[in-house]
């Protein structure tokens, strides 16, 4: 969806709002100039009947980038959902659902090449193609608070229960968050580039805990229930970069009053001036 807002008689500000379509969206620049890129990561997931579980909200990132006419950039907007399916831009290979558990929120990323979701840029030779990322929030099972995504370091998950795995920690700039282990459960993955970590119970295959939020580096999960960490954001590919965690005030992507974290699917807003 795009729309134009008049600024004065000589210039107008054009904005493109990109929502979650679970696919890569291409934007081709209509003019040469400076473009403002804003991204909101998605909230983490929870199980529908877990009324005391609070997944982490998604973070916010913004910056500017000078682009030529007819340049193409590619947007992956993160997904959230309250059940156990894997979520777009935070989908580990070979898994379609976290049965018994829940997924972390998907990151929202903008890149200069179309390689697919953020995880496919993990090779260092591809990471320079990433312009900006907003981290997704950590998932939560039973009760507690999933870690907010966003910022240079995502927030850790929090729960007061002693009968679950330790909470997952937030993703950082060069390493993913740590997935909380528990006796009898397997840590399948700690957080890593583009993906939140997770674990499961091996003698009941498919009984998962909560997954960390996606991000530049994903948050750690919790192998048995519990609260996962949020994914980190990234702004080194843009000028004037700024990022906020999902527990902080940030602009509303739909143009309303400021919000405290993004509590739904992710968004991307691209804006530029036309002479």
Where are each of the predicted segments found?
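Short, structured beta-strand segments at or near domain termini in extracellular proteins/domains
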Residues: 108, 133, 262-275
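Surface-exposed ligand/attachment interfaces on beta-rich extracellular proteins
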Residues: 20-29, 197-200
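Secretome/extracellular-domain signature
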Residues: 55-168
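Boundary/junction segments of secreted and surface-exposed precursor proteins
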Residues: 1, 12-22
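Extended extracellular/luminal ectodomain segments enriched in beta-structured repeat modules
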Residues: 29-36, 68-72
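Beta-strand-rich interaction surfaces with strong enrichment in secreted/lumenal proteins
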Residues: 16-17, 25-26, 50-52, 62-65
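Catalytic nucleophile loop of clan PA
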Residues: 95-122, 145-153, 175, 192-235
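Short, surface-exposed beta-strand/strand-loop-strand elements in extracellular ectodomains
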Residues: 46-56
């Amino acid at each position: 969806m795009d729309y134009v807002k008049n600024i004065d008689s000589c210039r107008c500000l054009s904005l493109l709002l990109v929502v979650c379509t679970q696919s890569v969206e291409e934007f081709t620049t209509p003019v040469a100039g400076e473009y403002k890129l804003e991204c909101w990561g998605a909230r983490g997931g929870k199980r529908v009947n877990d009324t005391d579980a609070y997944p982490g909200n998604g973070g916010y990132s913004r910056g500017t980038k000078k682009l030529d006419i007819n340049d193409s950039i590619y947007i992956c907007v993160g997904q959230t959902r309250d059940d156990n399916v894997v979520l777009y831009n935070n989908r580990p290979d070979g898994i379609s659902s976290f049965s018994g558990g829940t997924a972390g929120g998907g990151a929202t990323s903008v890149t200069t090449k179309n390689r697919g979701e953020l995880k496919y840029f993990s090779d260092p030779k591809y990471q320079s193609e990433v312009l900006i990322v907003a981290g997704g929030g950590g998932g939560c099972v039973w009760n507690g608070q999933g870690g907010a995504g966003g910022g240079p370091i995502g927030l850790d998950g929090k729960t007061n229960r002693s009968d679950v795995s330790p909470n997952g920690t937030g993703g950082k700039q060069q390493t993913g968050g740590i997935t909380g282990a528990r006796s009898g459960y397997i840590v399948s993955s700690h957080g890593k580039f583009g993906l939140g970590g997770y674990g499961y119970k091996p003698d009941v295959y498919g009984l998962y805990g909560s997954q960390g939020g996606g991000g530049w580096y994903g948050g750690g999960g919790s192998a048995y229930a519990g609260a996962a960490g949020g994914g980190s954001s990234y702004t080194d590919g843009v000028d004037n970069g700024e990022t906020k965690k999902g527990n902080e005030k940030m602009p509303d992507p739909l143009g309303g009053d400021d919000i405290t974290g993004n509590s739904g699917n992710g968004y991307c807003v691209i804006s530029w001036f036309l002479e």
